[in-house]
Amino acid sequence: MSSSFELSVQDLNDLLSDGSGCYSLPSQPCNEVVPRVYVGNASVAQDITQLQKLGITHVLNAAEGRSFMHVNTSASFYEDSGITYLGIKANDTQEFNLSAYFERATDFIDQALAHKNGRVLVHCREGYSRSPTLVIAYLMMRQKMDVKSALSTVRQNREIGPNDGFLAQLCQLNDRLAKEGKVKL
């Protein structure tokens, strides 16, 4: 490691697993991971009544698409409910460059929270890899958290397991923000 702030994917995986190296799957369809920011799965994202009960004003679909591993919703799906929508056509593979969407997702979450009663659901198919990665990036970029703090904050409130490619992208974001003096180490 060339600098004290650089972390490895293994460092982050250690935070995600229990002492035996096991990972837990989400026990709830949706969890509030930080105030007014929820991470959830496809079932809650497609349940307008449940979203309204939660007071969700914005939905960020990190798995937009028609294939099995995606969630086929769009702005028109939410149109009659008054929910603002953003879709990202992300694949849950180690090779997918989700970091290309960190800024756009962060801006959308900011937009939701700028409203007095704004609440945002960030979801993917399972609410386990893509969507928590985007929320972790948001916490790093806007709350000035380092990657371990951001990941731990989300993990305390929801079982998550971003794939190793996404964890590597979060490590790269951490390095960049640290070099720019934009995270608290």
UniProtKB/Swiss-Prot annotation:
Domain Tyrosine-protein phosphatase: 28-179
Official protein name in the record: Dual specificity protein phosphatase 3
A single GO cellular-component term on record: axonemal microtubule doublet inner sheath
Pfam families recorded: DSPc
Entry's family note: Belongs to the protein-tyrosine phosphatase family. Non-receptor class dual specificity subfamily.
Record keywords: Cell projection, Cilium, Cytoplasm, Cytoskeleton, Flagellum, Hydrolase, Nucleus, Protein phosphatase
InterPro entries in the record: Atypical_DUSP_subfamA (IPR020405), Dual-sp_phosphatase_cat-dom (IPR000340), Prot-tyrosine_phosphatase-like (IPR029021), Tyr_Pase_AS (IPR016130), Tyr_Pase_dom (IPR000387), TYR_PHOSPHATASE_DUAL_dom (IPR020422)
Enzyme class: hydrolase
SUPFAM superfamilies per UniProt: (Phosphotyrosine protein) phosphatases II
GO biological process, one term: cellular response to epidermal growth factor stimulus
Location within or outside the cell: Nucleus; Cytoplasm, Cytoskeleton, Flagellum axoneme
SMART domains: DSPc
Main location: nucleus
Binding partners and assembly: Microtubule inner protein component of sperm flagellar doublet microtubules. Interacts with VRK3; this interaction activates DUSP3 phosphatase activity.
GO molecular function, a single term: protein tyrosine phosphatase activity
